[in-house]
């Protein structure tokens, strides 16, 4: 059985050379090694956390990022490419996880702390 790799991007705008050098190039290499089950997703629901007031931007970016995936060499016959919001089981799992993690524990997470401070939610 091949190991599984799950990776993706939040479609908040166009991809650029940094995306390619930072991760896309490696995804294509891993895909072509045929040693892994590669799953690449467009995290449109996650993108809404930063762009809730402009969902149309996310919708448009999903298509653009999907085309960019194909352009750099991600091959749907070798990798599974999917959109987060199109998989209902992800929302179901999220509900279970939200019931397991308390607000106090969440607020201790350094990433969450930083975002709360940055967005002024703690005021």
Feature locations, PLM:
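N-terminal Rossmann-like or analogous alpha/beta NTP/dinucleotide-binding catalytic cores
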Residues: 3-123
């Amino acid at each position: 059985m091949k190991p599984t790799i799950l990776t993706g991007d939040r479609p908040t705008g166009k991809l650029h050379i940094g995306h390619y050098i930072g991760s896309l190039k490696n995804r294509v290499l891993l895909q072509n090694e045929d040693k892994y089950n590669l799953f690449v997703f467009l995290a449109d629901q996650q993108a809404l956390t930063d762009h809730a007031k402009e969902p149309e931007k996310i919708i448009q970016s999903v298509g653009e990022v999907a085309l960019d995936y194909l352009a750099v060499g991600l091959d749907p016959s070798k990798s599974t490419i999917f959109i987060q919001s199109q998989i209902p089981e992800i929302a179901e799992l999220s509900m279970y996880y939200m019931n397991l993690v308390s607000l106090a524990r969440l607020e201790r997470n350094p990433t969450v702390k930083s975002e709360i401070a940055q967005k002024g939610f703690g005021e």
